[in-house]
């Protein structure tokens, strides 16, 4: 498989009519014009903004599309459902293909019944919730109360979930049972000429332990102190266990039965993440999502690290984030290792950003990425970030126009 991709890239093979349609997807960022807590904000206006710059043409093999992240534990279920329906209706009204991203890992503010184990004065309090969050050692006595996230700026967030907790995983599956049928029903009712509007459903969101929700030594004591005094330490990509912060993952590793003493090793964290994603994908598949429309979102930071394996499972197509190697995916050894072993019909660059505002750099990067016909879509994170770099839109247009 890898050899086929590499030869196709070098030779610039064009399959023309035999090649599948591919997509450049623009992710509309939560909190920047769209927010599921305000369902009406996911309506036609945000689609029209994209279409004004990138109108689709039926004769183009590369089409543009829109995506949004629905964080299922961030808002009450009825609000999330309404937001999803508004989003899907707008996609149909504007004939815009979409990727529905369902996030079960981040922003679980609306489910204190899962994470609040320490504050009896607040909703959801239950000491047993220690089992649903991560620990800094092998005992639930070392459960964490706080975590930090840095997606451009460090902020305080709720604890990293225990990805192996039966109660937490069941809550994730319950939300899939709530949302996935809505997407499938919508797709089923589309006329034949609009069936292509559902590119796919993506599960997971850079699934990892300690990557997007990390903890500092003595972090629980910081909860009662001003955030301005919080430590800020650089992300250490080479440290595949703790990323240079406090080691967590003990809860998930112990709950999953991998080990309950000694030191955590790299395969432990990989196996937990892979099993978690496979569980979610199996649930979605059982609900009726075909493999070619189901994507699992993995990530890796150190070249070739085992975490890249996490999104590969029998139920979905693997997908990864690309920042460091966005200019040339052939250099991403972790992704290439998994493309060579995956039997999935497709894969995706489901979170993508090239750190350049140069039009030709973007054109060339997209050409390299989509030279593999198995790459279903590239999702640019985010649409809102493009405004500061006019060359990005120019590069995308140039690439699309160059395709037959």
Give the positions of each predicted feature.
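Boundary at the C-terminal end of the N-terminal hydrophobic targeting segment
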Residues: 15-18
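Well-ordered, non-membrane alpha-helical segments in soluble/globular domains
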Residues: 37-55, 76-87, 169-187, 268-282, ...
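Aromatic-lined substrate-binding rim segments of carbohydrate-active enzymes
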Residues: 43-149, 277-284
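Polysaccharide-binding and catalytic clefts of secreted carbohydrate-active enzymes
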Residues: 129-308
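Sec-dependent signal peptide recognition
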Residues: 1-8
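The substrate-binding groove and active-site-proximal loops of carbohydrate-active enzymes
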Residues: 30-39, 67-79, 156-178, 259-274, ...
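Acidic (Asp/Glu)-rich catalytic clusters
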Residues: 49-61, 85-95, 309-313, 335-343, ...
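Substrate-binding cleft of secreted/luminal carbohydrate-active enzymes
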Residues: 21-22, 31, 96-109, 315-404
């Amino acid at each position: 498989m890898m050899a086929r991709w590499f030869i196709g890239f070098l030779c610039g093979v064009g399959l023309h009519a035999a090649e599948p349609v591919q997509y450049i997807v623009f992710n509309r960022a939560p909190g920047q014009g769209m927010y599921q807590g305000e369902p009406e904000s996911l309506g036609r206006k945000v689609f029209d903004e994209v279409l004004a710059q990138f109108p689709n043409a039926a004769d183009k093999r590369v089409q543009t599309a829109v995506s949004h992240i629905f964080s299922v534990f961030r808002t009450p279920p009825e609000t999330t459902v309404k937001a999803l329906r508004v989003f899907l209706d707008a996609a149909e009204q504007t004939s815009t293909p979409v990727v529905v991203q369902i996030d079960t890992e981040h922003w679980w503010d609306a489910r204190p019944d899962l994470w609040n184990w320490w504050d009896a004065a607040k909703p959801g309090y239950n000491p047993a919730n220690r089992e649903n969050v991560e620990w800094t050692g092998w005992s639930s006595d070392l459960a964490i109360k706080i975590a930090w996230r840095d997606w451009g700026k460090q902020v305080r967030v709720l604890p990293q979930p225990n990805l192996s907790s039966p109660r937490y995983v069941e809550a994730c599956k319950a939300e899939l049972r709530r949302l996935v049928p809505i997407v499938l029903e919508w797709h089923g009712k589309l006329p034949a000429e609009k069936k292509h509007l559902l590119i796919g459903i993506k599960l997971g969101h850079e699934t990892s332990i300690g990557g997007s929700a990390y903890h500092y030594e003595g972090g629980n004591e910081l909860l009662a102190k001003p955030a301005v005094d919080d430590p800020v330490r650089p992300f250490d990509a080479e440290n595949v266990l703790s990323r240079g912060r406090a080691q967590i993952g003990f809860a998930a590793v112990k709950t999953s039965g991998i080990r309950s003493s000694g030191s955590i090793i790299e395969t432990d964290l990989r196996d937990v993440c892979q099993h978690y994603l496979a569980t979610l994908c199996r649930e979605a598949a059982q609900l009726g999502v075909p493999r070619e429309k189901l994507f699992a979102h993995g990530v890796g930071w150190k070249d070739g690290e085992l975490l890249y394996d996490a999104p590969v499972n029998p139920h979905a197509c693997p997908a990864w984030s690309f920042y460091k190697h966005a200019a040339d995916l052939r250099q991403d050894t972790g992704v290439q290792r998994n493309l060579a072993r995956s039997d999935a019909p497709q894969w995706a660059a489901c979170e993508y950003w090239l750190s350049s505002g140069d039009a030709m750099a973007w054109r060339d990067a997209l050409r390299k990425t989509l030279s593999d016909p198995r790459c279903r879509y590239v999702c640019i994170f985010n649409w809102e970030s493009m405004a500061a770099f006019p060359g990005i839109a120019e590069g995308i247009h140039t690439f699309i126009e160059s395709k037959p």
